[in-house]
Regions:
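Acidic, Ala/Val/Gly-enriched low-complexity intrinsically disordered segments
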Residues: 4-8, 16-17
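"…together with the soluble PPM/PP2C metallo-phosphatase catalytic core" -> "…together
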Residues: 15-257
Protein backbone atom coordinates (compact mmCIF):
# COMPACT_ATOMS: atom_id res chain seq x y z
CA UNK A 1 0.00 0.00 0.00
CA UNK A 2 1.39 3.41 -0.96
CA UNK A 3 1.91 6.22 1.56
CA UNK A 4 -0.97 8.17 0.01
CA UNK A 5 -3.26 5.16 0.40
CA UNK A 6 -2.20 4.64 4.02
CA UNK A 7 -2.80 8.31 4.84
CA UNK A 8 -6.16 8.26 3.07
CA UNK A 9 -7.23 5.12 4.91
CA UNK A 10 -6.18 6.59 8.27
CA UNK A 11 -7.81 9.99 7.87
CA UNK A 12 -10.81 8.64 5.98
CA UNK A 13 -12.94 11.54 5.88
CA UNK A 14 -14.50 13.39 8.71
CA UNK A 15 -17.72 12.45 6.97
CA UNK A 16 -17.15 9.81 4.22
CA UNK A 17 -14.72 9.21 1.40
CA UNK A 18 -17.21 10.13 -1.26
CA UNK A 19 -20.60 11.80 -1.03
CA UNK A 20 -22.02 8.87 -2.95
CA UNK A 21 -20.65 6.46 -0.33
CA UNK A 22 -22.94 7.92 2.33
CA UNK A 23 -26.14 5.84 2.47
CA UNK A 24 -28.94 7.93 1.00
CA UNK A 25 -31.09 7.39 4.09
CA UNK A 26 -28.30 8.68 6.34
CA UNK A 27 -27.76 11.72 4.13
CA UNK A 28 -31.45 12.60 3.98
CA UNK A 29 -31.89 12.17 7.73
CA UNK A 30 -28.83 14.30 8.51
CA UNK A 31 -29.87 17.11 6.17
CA UNK A 32 -33.43 17.03 7.51
CA UNK A 33 -32.17 17.21 11.09
CA UNK A 34 -29.97 20.21 10.27
CA UNK A 35 -32.80 22.02 8.52
CA UNK A 36 -35.33 21.31 11.26
CA UNK A 37 -33.01 22.48 14.03
CA UNK A 38 -32.20 25.68 12.11
CA UNK A 39 -35.90 26.34 11.49
CA UNK A 40 -36.72 25.94 15.17
CA UNK A 41 -33.80 28.11 16.30
CA UNK A 42 -34.72 30.82 13.80
CA UNK A 43 -38.08 31.33 15.52
CA UNK A 44 -36.44 32.43 18.78
CA UNK A 45 -35.24 35.86 17.71
CA UNK A 46 -33.07 37.25 20.49
CA UNK A 47 -34.65 35.11 23.20
CA UNK A 48 -32.73 32.58 25.24
CA UNK A 49 -29.04 32.24 26.12
CA UNK A 50 -28.01 32.37 22.46
CA UNK A 51 -30.03 35.47 21.59
CA UNK A 52 -27.98 38.36 20.21
CA UNK A 53 -28.26 41.34 17.87
CA UNK A 54 -26.36 41.26 14.60
CA UNK A 55 -24.32 43.95 12.85
CA UNK A 56 -27.53 45.68 11.66
CA UNK A 57 -29.07 45.60 15.13
CA UNK A 58 -31.59 42.88 14.28
CA UNK A 59 -32.44 40.08 16.75
CA UNK A 60 -30.65 36.87 15.87
CA UNK A 61 -29.62 33.51 17.30
CA UNK A 62 -25.92 32.72 17.46
CA UNK A 63 -24.43 29.20 17.53
CA UNK A 64 -26.45 28.33 14.44
CA UNK A 65 -23.74 25.78 13.77
CA UNK A 66 -25.60 23.57 16.24
CA UNK A 67 -27.87 22.74 13.30
CA UNK A 68 -24.88 21.25 11.48
CA UNK A 69 -23.83 19.44 14.65
CA UNK A 70 -27.32 17.98 14.89
CA UNK A 71 -26.97 16.60 11.37
CA UNK A 72 -23.60 15.06 12.21
CA UNK A 73 -25.00 13.41 15.33
CA UNK A 74 -27.84 11.88 13.34
CA UNK A 75 -25.38 10.63 10.72
CA UNK A 76 -23.13 9.18 13.40
CA UNK A 77 -26.06 7.44 15.06
CA UNK A 78 -27.02 5.82 11.77
CA UNK A 79 -23.52 4.96 10.53
CA UNK A 80 -20.98 3.78 13.11
CA UNK A 81 -18.14 4.14 10.61
CA UNK A 82 -18.53 7.92 10.75
CA UNK A 83 -18.29 8.26 14.53
CA UNK A 84 -14.49 8.39 14.98
CA UNK A 85 -14.13 11.06 12.31
CA UNK A 86 -17.01 13.14 13.64
CA UNK A 87 -15.58 12.86 17.17
CA UNK A 88 -12.36 14.63 16.09
CA UNK A 89 -14.38 17.78 15.40
CA UNK A 90 -16.12 18.00 18.76
CA UNK A 91 -13.37 19.80 20.73
CA UNK A 92 -13.86 22.69 18.29
CA UNK A 93 -17.63 22.56 18.74
CA UNK A 94 -17.33 22.57 22.54
CA UNK A 95 -14.88 25.47 22.59
CA UNK A 96 -16.97 27.47 20.15
CA UNK A 97 -20.23 26.84 21.99
CA UNK A 98 -18.67 27.89 25.29
CA UNK A 99 -17.66 31.22 23.77
CA UNK A 100 -21.08 31.65 22.12
CA UNK A 101 -22.86 31.07 25.42
CA UNK A 102 -20.86 33.18 27.87
CA UNK A 103 -18.17 34.97 25.86
CA UNK A 104 -17.92 38.76 25.73
CA UNK A 105 -16.49 41.01 22.99
CA UNK A 106 -14.20 42.76 25.48
CA UNK A 107 -11.18 40.73 24.36
CA UNK A 108 -10.53 39.98 20.69
CA UNK A 109 -7.80 38.13 18.86
CA UNK A 110 -4.86 36.22 20.23
CA UNK A 111 -3.34 39.40 21.63
CA UNK A 112 -6.50 40.29 23.51
CA UNK A 113 -6.90 36.89 25.13
CA UNK A 114 -3.22 36.50 25.97
CA UNK A 115 -3.17 40.03 27.36
CA UNK A 116 -6.10 39.15 29.63
CA UNK A 117 -4.24 36.04 30.77
CA UNK A 118 -1.21 38.15 31.74
CA UNK A 119 -3.55 40.16 33.94
CA UNK A 120 -4.73 36.95 35.60
CA UNK A 121 -8.02 36.60 33.70
CA UNK A 122 -8.93 33.45 31.79
CA UNK A 123 -11.36 34.36 29.01
CA UNK A 124 -13.75 32.03 27.21
CA UNK A 125 -11.83 32.89 24.06
CA UNK A 126 -8.68 31.51 25.64
CA UNK A 127 -10.54 28.33 26.58
CA UNK A 128 -11.77 28.12 23.00
CA UNK A 129 -8.16 28.34 21.80
CA UNK A 130 -7.29 25.54 24.22
CA UNK A 131 -10.07 23.28 22.98
CA UNK A 132 -9.14 24.06 19.38
CA UNK A 133 -5.49 23.31 20.00
CA UNK A 134 -6.34 19.99 21.64
CA UNK A 135 -8.63 19.10 18.75
CA UNK A 136 -5.94 19.98 16.21
CA UNK A 137 -3.38 17.82 18.02
CA UNK A 138 -5.85 14.94 18.04
CA UNK A 139 -6.59 15.33 14.34
CA UNK A 140 -2.90 15.48 13.42
CA UNK A 141 -2.12 12.46 15.60
CA UNK A 142 -4.76 10.41 13.80
CA UNK A 143 -2.65 10.61 10.66
CA UNK A 144 0.11 8.72 12.46
CA UNK A 145 2.95 10.74 10.93
CA UNK A 146 6.31 9.97 12.59
CA UNK A 147 7.83 13.17 11.19
CA UNK A 148 7.79 15.90 13.83
CA UNK A 149 7.75 18.84 11.42
CA UNK A 150 4.85 17.37 9.47
CA UNK A 151 2.93 16.66 12.66
CA UNK A 152 3.23 20.25 13.85
CA UNK A 153 2.43 21.71 10.44
CA UNK A 154 -0.70 19.54 10.29
CA UNK A 155 -1.67 20.70 13.77
CA UNK A 156 -1.20 24.32 12.72
CA UNK A 157 -3.32 23.86 9.58
CA UNK A 158 -6.28 22.44 11.48
CA UNK A 159 -6.11 24.89 14.40
CA UNK A 160 -5.57 28.02 12.32
CA UNK A 161 -8.13 27.03 9.69
CA UNK A 162 -10.73 26.68 12.44
CA UNK A 163 -9.86 30.11 13.83
CA UNK A 164 -9.78 31.71 10.37
CA UNK A 165 -13.40 30.73 9.80
CA UNK A 166 -14.21 32.17 13.19
CA UNK A 167 -12.77 35.49 11.97
CA UNK A 168 -14.85 35.29 8.79
CA UNK A 169 -18.19 34.80 10.53
CA UNK A 170 -19.05 38.51 10.71
CA UNK A 171 -21.56 38.74 7.85
CA UNK A 172 -24.33 36.44 6.63
CA UNK A 173 -23.10 33.53 4.48
CA UNK A 174 -19.48 34.75 4.44
CA UNK A 175 -18.02 31.74 6.24
CA UNK A 176 -20.25 29.34 4.30
CA UNK A 177 -19.16 30.80 0.95
CA UNK A 178 -15.51 30.53 1.95
CA UNK A 179 -16.07 26.95 3.06
CA UNK A 180 -17.79 25.89 -0.16
CA UNK A 181 -15.16 27.64 -2.29
CA UNK A 182 -12.22 26.16 -0.38
CA UNK A 183 -13.72 22.68 -0.49
CA UNK A 184 -14.00 22.79 -4.26
CA UNK A 185 -10.39 23.95 -4.56
CA UNK A 186 -9.40 20.55 -3.20
CA UNK A 187 -9.58 17.40 -5.27
CA UNK A 188 -12.97 15.85 -6.10
CA UNK A 189 -12.13 13.05 -3.67
CA UNK A 190 -11.59 15.54 -0.90
CA UNK A 191 -14.79 17.42 -1.72
CA UNK A 192 -16.53 14.09 -1.17
CA UNK A 193 -15.09 13.87 2.34
CA UNK A 194 -16.85 17.12 3.16
CA UNK A 195 -20.11 16.00 1.59
CA UNK A 196 -22.17 15.79 4.73
CA UNK A 197 -21.43 19.38 5.74
CA UNK A 198 -21.55 20.70 2.19
CA UNK A 199 -25.08 19.39 1.75
CA UNK A 200 -26.17 19.79 5.36
CA UNK A 201 -25.40 23.51 5.27
CA UNK A 202 -27.81 24.15 2.39
CA UNK A 203 -31.08 24.24 4.38
CA UNK A 204 -29.33 26.15 7.16
CA UNK A 205 -28.03 28.78 4.72
CA UNK A 206 -31.54 30.01 3.95
CA UNK A 207 -32.08 31.05 7.56
CA UNK A 208 -28.68 32.73 7.79
CA UNK A 209 -29.38 34.63 4.55
CA UNK A 210 -32.48 36.11 6.21
CA UNK A 211 -30.45 37.05 9.31
CA UNK A 212 -32.34 34.76 11.65
CA UNK A 213 -29.30 32.76 12.75
CA UNK A 214 -25.53 32.96 12.46
CA UNK A 215 -22.98 30.17 12.63
CA UNK A 216 -21.31 31.61 15.69
CA UNK A 217 -18.03 30.25 16.96
CA UNK A 218 -19.72 26.85 17.20
CA UNK A 219 -20.37 26.52 13.48
CA UNK A 220 -17.45 28.54 12.16
CA UNK A 221 -14.89 26.47 14.05
CA UNK A 222 -16.64 23.26 13.01
CA UNK A 223 -16.44 24.17 9.32
CA UNK A 224 -12.86 25.39 9.55
CA UNK A 225 -11.70 22.32 11.45
CA UNK A 226 -13.41 19.98 8.98
CA UNK A 227 -11.76 21.79 6.08
CA UNK A 228 -8.37 21.69 7.82
CA UNK A 229 -8.63 17.94 8.43
CA UNK A 230 -9.56 17.47 4.80
CA UNK A 231 -6.62 19.59 3.65
CA UNK A 232 -3.99 17.66 5.59
CA UNK A 233 -5.34 14.46 4.11
CA UNK A 234 -5.47 15.72 0.52
CA UNK A 235 -2.39 17.95 0.16
CA UNK A 236 1.22 16.79 -0.13
CA UNK A 237 3.63 17.61 2.68
CA UNK A 238 4.95 20.75 0.97
CA UNK A 239 1.42 21.96 0.31
CA UNK A 240 0.47 21.52 3.95
CA UNK A 241 3.56 23.40 5.13
CA UNK A 242 2.85 26.24 2.71
CA UNK A 243 -0.78 26.34 3.81
CA UNK A 244 0.29 26.50 7.46
CA UNK A 245 2.62 29.41 6.67
CA UNK A 246 -0.13 31.22 4.75
CA UNK A 247 -2.54 30.81 7.65
CA UNK A 248 0.04 32.23 10.07
CA UNK A 249 0.49 35.28 7.82
CA UNK A 250 -3.28 35.78 7.56
CA UNK A 251 -3.67 35.65 11.32
CA UNK A 252 -0.86 38.14 11.91
CA UNK A 253 -2.50 40.47 9.38
CA UNK A 254 -5.96 40.00 10.92
CA UNK A 255 -4.65 40.96 14.36
CA UNK A 256 -4.14 44.51 13.07
CA UNK A 257 -6.65 44.82 10.24
CA UNK A 258 -10.37 44.38 9.63
CA UNK A 259 -11.43 41.67 7.20
CA UNK A 260 -14.79 43.37 6.68
CA UNK A 261 -13.14 46.71 5.88
CA UNK A 262 -10.74 44.98 3.46
CA UNK A 263 -13.70 43.41 1.62
CA UNK A 264 -15.72 46.64 1.63
CA UNK A 265 -12.94 48.53 -0.19
CA UNK A 266 -12.89 46.04 -3.09
CA UNK A 267 -15.98 46.06 -5.34
CA UNK A 268 -15.65 42.47 -6.56
CA UNK A 269 -15.18 41.05 -3.07
CA UNK A 270 -17.95 43.29 -1.75
CA UNK A 271 -20.37 41.99 -4.39
CA UNK A 272 -19.47 38.37 -3.64
CA UNK A 273 -19.83 39.02 0.07
CA UNK A 274 -23.29 40.56 -0.34
CA UNK A 275 -24.57 37.95 -2.78
CA UNK A 276 -27.37 35.79 -1.42
CA UNK A 277 -28.44 37.98 1.47
CA UNK A 278 -28.23 41.67 0.49
CA UNK A 279 -31.67 41.53 -1.14
CA UNK A 280 -33.12 41.01 2.33
CA UNK A 281 -31.47 44.03 3.98
CA UNK A 282 -29.21 47.02 3.40
CA UNK A 283 -25.66 45.72 3.96
CA UNK A 284 -23.33 47.73 6.17
CA UNK A 285 -19.62 47.58 5.72
CA UNK A 286 -18.33 48.61 9.13
CA UNK A 287 -17.65 46.21 11.99
Amino acid sequence: MSLAQRVDSRIRPPFAEMLTSIPIGTLIAAVAASGLFAALQATLGSRGPLGRTNFTGEPIQTAGGLALVCGLLVAGAMDAALRPEIAVLFPFVIGGLLDDLVGTPAHKGFRGHLGALRRGKVTTGLLKIGFGGAGALWAAARLGSPHEIRFWSDTAVVALMANLFNLLDLRPLRALKAYWFAAFLLSPRSVGTLGLLLVGAIPYAGFEARRRVMLGDTGAMLLGAALGVCAIGALPVLGRCLLAALLVVLHVWAERNSISAFIARRPVLRAIDAFGWSQFTDPRSTE
